[in-house]
């Protein structure tokens, strides 16, 4: 028997029985172990928090299947598949559900030394990686990361593996800032960006950052990021707001020659080196195994999938304060 989490309407999440497709000679049956809530994407869909006419408006239709980051174990192997076996632990981009039938090309293998709670960040790490590709990061750059939710935490950790000179992180929540420091941030500043621009410049020795990552999905951030970034600097928008009409440009854009680039999960498609996202997952696992990238202790809340409504209401009410929120599928027997 298979179960999946479904948004049946605005702010309504349930666990319901689901019908699986038949196993074919070229597919795998997976049993989920853990799946991570994307508190940005999924809360936008859960609360129907977006403008009419946006891509959100055309995508989010109820019933809606949330989720895209699952750690699972192989339960059955199609007869034509030779390089996977029952018991192998894998990751898959799939909605929150107890079981999945997938092709071999949809999975990446998890090294034994990496726990489920570390591995489950693979998809969020991939999205952050797309942001770094869009940034065309320069050696020695001073970088500011605005927002240290799950996505911002991944950006900080990727930056820490590069030759950036300084990584300053701005967020209202001290606990999230502490996690960012563990992930490699060189400076952390608590508060709202509009009140902390001078503090950022001071921390950077009187310099403005050459590069800013906006990981907030808060439309008010862009105008203040434009004030903060250096002349001819770059702003990468990773947080996908549901209210783009509320994002405002300032005269800094033209007068100071600033570049703004959007980065999205799908932007690695067609990339000559990273078009197969499994290569990014494998790199992520290599860095986890070597200790150069850590996702340990980033999960702060764990839920039985039968508590889906409770999980999303908590994520909504404590937005900006939680770390990773995880569904533990071992609770379903």
Could you tell me what each predicted segment is?
Residues 198, 202, 206, 247-299, ...:
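C-terminal substrate-binding/catalytic core of Rossmann-like NAD(P)-dependent dehydrogenases/reductases
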Residues 178, 183-261:
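Glycine-rich cofactor phosphate-binding loops and adjacent beta1-alpha1 units
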Residues 18-70:
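N-terminal glycine-rich beta->alpha transition that marks the start or flank
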Residues 69-93:
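A glycine-/small-residue-rich N-terminal strand-loop-strand element
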Residues 34, 69, 88-89, 99, ...:
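Residue-level marker of beta-strand positions
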Residues 115-193:
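Mid-domain Rossmann-like dinucleotide-binding core that forms the NAD(H)/NADP(H) cofactor-binding site
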Residues 93-104:
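A structural motif shared across PLP-dependent enzymes of the aminotransferase-like
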